[in-house]
């Protein structure tokens, strides 16, 4: 329905726009429709020694982002919590079987509590609504966190979605042949069905390893036919117990095409030496990738680092120079550039061990190793595989291994423009990656000072190992546990100290304690309801503060990254913390320093933690607004109600966590934006000019680059934001005025004079 409305809007827009056009505009549109296919083109290449502003901003090291808006994610989160058992498959995929069983128990207990309250509405309603609100809030937050992994649930509907494999690039302008594609399809079809109850992550981990082995054992044969083969992955009918997916490929070749394909197979096996030269293959490769980069690199989306197999095989291509197959790129004749964007090439070359005198390239689908990287260690291993090559062993966790199968099961239809952008992103990382540049750094082994050439990833690996070895405090975990226990027992304690004096507490009986615990005469339904409410409050409150502790730990790690990064150019502190040390005495060193800065800023959880912090921030504002409204309604009777006391406890605990996060975030920004480092390096350059006048011109150049870097960092750096929301300025101002107006009313009522906080400039 929505697509039909958009089509109707586009049609009417073009219709009324036709009345405004003049001859010059119509001629320009005709030129644009023809496209650039008839324009003369020259060979070109991208210079990897230059940097983009994305490197300084940090978007070069992109992170995963959801493909649907947050409003839809919120709606889906609420639906998945309200109808929790109906989405059991989804919850098992994004959590685990044990956690799902635990959450299912809490869900049924909450349903029983609501039913008992409707039957006997004697207990305070806040004791029932509190856990319910927490359940809805955390379910929505979790749905937004995992939205980068699965964007559509794999329900049992009748609409079976399809997903096309990316077109692979092979020899002289030809497609991958049918035999090899069929072998890959048969390899993929051997994926076994898995029962849900049999260890979800373990099963997916094993199946994915099996699938990768089956595909990687197949070589690549090429043919000369320019016709395109479209391998398609179909989703079978999914059942709650068993999920199977199957790949089918339809291809038609003539007899002449089969002969040419057989000839190229002999070439790949080393039978014939009539291979194209390496220079020809590299020239074609540069033309292909340049064309793709021009077409696709138009957005700044956060995309995941995918298809490590394809990048690994390209690294092998630099080592195996005698037996490389020629690459190709097929672009169908079309009337616009938009049609050619649907052809995304998965470029890969590699060699197979054990073949003397020749090697065969491995061409795989670009989605072969798609992962979501829920933890920072998995992402680091993918970086090593991506930038160093297959010799780096990647220890991918079960979460990232399961992400590929989950994505295939979801049947998500991806935008071809996004696929092209992801290819260009990987191509840039491969050709101008930080791992290709090295700096002469100083390391300490005991009391000895030694030099070695290190890349950005090697330096960052040492920094991350120091951060991981840091002993984290448990103060905020203890605070969360204390607040959890206090909120769980609060209704009982409130009734106890309100109805009993200190003298009466000494002689209180067990029956009276049970009555105060239930808040009503202790009949069986009331006792069951009170026990359920206590258990729900205890578990859900602990889960909420557990998420807060995760956010606090992440902010602490970000601060440690920034702290160690600021010590790299200091010899004394670098030796103290056992990290590499180098000076910004060369332009190349400045480039590596900026790359390391951007890389460390993007390490670890980003958007997922921002979702948690944003939710806590909005919850704190909501509670503050409710408390202000209650105080304005009657400040003398404000503390008579138990839920107002609960609001105050929640507000105090959340403010403590938010103050901690705000202090860590601001300190992290200060460490990364510390201009004194660059100023100190400029002073060092002047000192070197005085000692070595013959290098004055070179040192002056470096000094000018340092000045430009200082200005650029000041231009791009933004102040720390506690909430991860991109808020409209109008909505922000309205929210600020409403909240501050309520607080101003409370303060004016308590102090006796008018004060208007919203007029104070923030």
Swiss-Prot record:
Subunit structure, as described in the record: Interacts with FEM1B.
Record has Transcription as a keyword: no
Phosphoserine modification, residue list: 272, 276-277, 334, 336
Tissue and organ distribution: Widely expressed with highest levels in testis.
Pfam families: PHTF1-2_N
Segments of this protein annotated with the region Disordered: 152-184, 344-380, 393-415
Protein name listed in UniProt: Protein PHTF1
Location of this chain's protein in the cell: Endoplasmic reticulum membrane; Golgi apparatus, cis-Golgi network membrane
Cellular component terms (Gene Ontology): endoplasmic reticulum membrane; Golgi apparatus
Originating species: Homo sapiens
InterPro entries: PHTF1/2, PHTF1/2_N
Basic and acidic residues compositional bias, start-end: 365-376
Glycosylation sites: 179-180, 363, 431, 674, 733
Key word Membrane present: yes
Domain PHTF: 6-150
Biased composition (Low complexity): 348-361
Main location per the UniProt record: endoplasmic reticulum
Signal peptide residues on this chain, from the entry's feature table: none
UniProtKB keywords: Endoplasmic reticulum, Glycoprotein, Golgi apparatus, Membrane, Phosphoprotein, Transmembrane, Transmembrane helix
Mode of membrane association: Multi-pass membrane protein
Membrane-spanning parts: 77-97, 99-119, 121-141, 473-493, 512-532, 611-631, 645-665, 737-757
